[in-house]
UniProtKB/Swiss-Prot annotation:
Keyword terms of this UniProt record: Cell membrane, Coiled coil, Cytoplasm, Membrane, Transport
Region (Disordered): 1-28
Record organism: Bos taurus
Name this polypeptide is given: Syntaxin-19
Domain called t-SNARE coiled-coil homology: residue spans: 209-271
Length: 292
């Protein structure tokens, strides 16, 4: 059998020489990769700053959600008592706090959108920082949107309860008024229908009248709250339309990542097969005495 060990040594030397010749190119390529990684590491403080702001914004949304839940718990039952001034005052303070928090969160989400666009211009839409900001904005905006919808439903339910209470009081007093007429009084505040002549005409007491007027004040207060939040809901609806494209983009990126991972697995499998078929290993086998 022919001894091919000298041939193996010769090929090994040629391989080493070819590696020495390719060193500048390889180092340049590696330097390019390391430079890119270095840029990411240098930008880590920027990412941490964004994450710190995101955490503060998320805490604000959680506090808003808690206040909305407290407001909703208070509206589950209407207290048919004349001593409701303190309760109304407390509800009004919570509503004002919710409004301030919602406006603050809305400004924070707007600033985050600006940061996303800035990151896209500087690093591209597929950079790590950009994708993190997009995902965090989408998640927090969805949470904020659900909270505000819950608050709106709570206010609408309370309006309906107050309206039902007023109709019931009028029925008990024996005064039947058309629903449209009562609604006009509620919207316009024309309570001259409940004057002294009405008190003498029907058997309604001043206590009942005061309770009805109290409910009317609640309705007026609720309508003012809805008017204050109208602009905010319009901005939310516009952001929903913008978020649709962002969510679709994120979904496409995730699907692309899955395809890339599958392709990488296939390439690793081929690499294992090519490694098993390495010609150097075949030459080594021919040199072994056991194969003689």
């Amino acid at each position: 059998m022919k001894d091919r060990l000298p041939e193996l040594k010769q090929r090994t030397k040629e391989t080493e020489l070819s590696k020495d010749k390719d060193v500048p190119t390889t180092e340049a390529e590696e330097q390019g990769v390391f430079l890119q990684q270095a840029v990411i590491y240098e930008r880590e403080p920027v990412a941490e700053r964004h994450l710190h702001e995101i955490q503060k914004l998320q805490e604000s949304i959680n506090n808003l959600t808690d206040n909305v839940q407290k407001f909703g718990q208070q509206q589950k039952s209407l207290v048919a008592s004349m001593r409701r001034f303190s309760l109304l005052k407390k509800e009004s303070s919570i509503a004002k706090e919710i409004k301030i928090q919602a406006e603050h969160i809305n400004r924070g989400l707007d600033d985050l959108v600006k940061e996303v666009k800035k990151s896209e211009d500087e690093s591209g839409p597929s950079s790590v920082v950009t994708r993190i900001l997009k995902f965090q904005h989408a998640a927090m905006f969805r949470h904020f949107q659900q909270t505000m919808f819950t608050y709106n439903d709570t206010i609408a339910a309370k309006q309906e309860k107050c309206r039902t209470f007023i109709f019931r009081q009028l029925e008990v007093a024996g005064k039947e008024l058309p629903e449209e007429e009562v609604n006009d009084m509620l919207h316009q505040g024309k309570w001259e229908v409940f004057n002294e002549s009405l008190l003498t005409e029907i058997s309604i007491t001043k206590a009942q009248l005061s309770e009805i007027e109290q409910r009317h004040k609640e309705l007026v207060n609720l309508e003012n709250q809805i008017k204050d939040l109208r602009d905010l809901f319009i901005q939310i609806s516009l952001l929903v339309e913008e978020q649709g494209e962002s969510v679709n983009s994120i979904e496409m990126i995730v699907n692309g990542t899955k395809e890339y991972v599958n392709t990488t697995k296939e390439k690793f499998g081929l690499a294992v097969k090519y490694k098993k078929r390495n010609p150097c290993k075949i030459l080594c086998c021919w040199c072994c005495p056991c194969c003689g």
